């Protein structure tokens, strides 16, 4: 059975274009995988930023963690497990000031863990999360996908590839201030054309 992990990150809640787009992508995937299990994580509801106690907790063997470390590591381990168990990731990438939202960066920090999602070898890093697909809902007011102003999509593609997820598609509703209806129509067409 297919497991789909949906990651939303906009602070705009239900009014977010990226949230509407991740829902459309999810609907498209469910047409092809009606029995899929869907796991959703809304990063705007909060995800811990990494810090010293976080680092000490997640890199301590579970059986050696203190009670405080167990509590800190609980969410980090749950986030990591969600990604490991997913076959398809649907990730909202709203562009804030040319980059990704801080909460999406925090999610990436939770999943880019040496020994869990990648290892270093003599020939370089090797991602461990292979065999997965990611579909990214890229939204922006004025930043075109892939432009020199876009510091979000290349970063996310790099991070996903680093952990082994190389099958990545982008669906863009970009430059919304220059025509929201046209941008959404292009995004809808891209969703319809997705190989599910």
Curated annotation (Swiss-Prot):
InterPro entries attached to this UniProt entry: Flavodoxin_fold, Flavoprotein-like_sf, FMN-dep_NADH:Q_OxRdtase_AzoR1, NADH:quinone_OxRdtase_FMN_depd
Gene3D superfamilies on file: 3.40.50.360
Enzyme Commission number(s) of this protein: 1.6.5.-, 1.7.1.17
Physiological role: Quinone reductase that provides resistance to thiol-specific stress caused by electrophilic quinones. Also exhibits azoreductase activity. Catalyzes the reductive cleavage of the azo bond in aromatic azo compounds to the corresponding amines.
GO molecular function: electron transfer activity; FMN binding; oxidoreductase activity, acting on NAD(P)H as acceptor; oxidoreductase activity, acting on NAD(P)H, quinone or similar compound as acceptor
Enzymatic reactions: 2 a quinone + NADH + H(+) = 2 a 1,4-benzosemiquinone + NAD(+); N,N-dimethyl-1,4-phenylenediamine + anthranilate + 2 NAD(+) = 2-(4-dimethylaminophenyl)diazenylbenzoate + 2 NADH + 2 H(+)
Matching Pfam families: Flavodoxin_2
Species: Cereibacter sphaeroides (strain ATCC 17029 / ATH 2.4.9)
Cofactor note (record): Binds 1 FMN per subunit.
Subunit record text: Homodimer.
EC primary class: oxidoreductase
Cysteine pairings via disulfide bonds: none
Family: Belongs to the azoreductase type 1 family.
Record bears the keyword Flavoprotein: yes
Protein name: FMN-dependent NADH:quinone oxidoreductase
Cofactor: FMN
Gene: azoR
């Amino acid at each position: 059975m297919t497991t789909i992990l949906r990651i939303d990150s906009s602070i705009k809640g239900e009014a977010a274009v990226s949230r509407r787009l991740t829902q459309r992508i999810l609907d498209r995937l469910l047409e092809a995988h009606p029995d899929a299990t869907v796991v959703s994580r809304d990063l705007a509801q909060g995800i811990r930023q990494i810090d010293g106690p976080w680092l000490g907790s997640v890199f301590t063997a579970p059986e050696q963690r203190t009670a405080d470390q167990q509590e800190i590591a609980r969410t980090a381990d749950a986030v990591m497990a969600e990604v490991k168990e997913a076959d398809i990731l649907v990730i909202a990438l709203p562009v804030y000031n040319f980059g990704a939202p801080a909460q999406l960066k925090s999610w990436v920090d939770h999943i880019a863990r040496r020994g869990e999602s990648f290892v270093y070898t003599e020939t370089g890093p090797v991602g461990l999360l292979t065999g997965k697909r990611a579909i990214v809902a890229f939204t922006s007011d004025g930043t075109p996908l892939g432009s020199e102003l876009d510091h979000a999509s290349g970063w996310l593609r790099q991070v996903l590839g680093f952990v082994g997820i190389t099958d990545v598609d982008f669906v863009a509703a970009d430059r919304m201030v220059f025509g929201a209806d046209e941008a959404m129509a292009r995004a809808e067409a891209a969703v319809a054309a997705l190989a599910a």
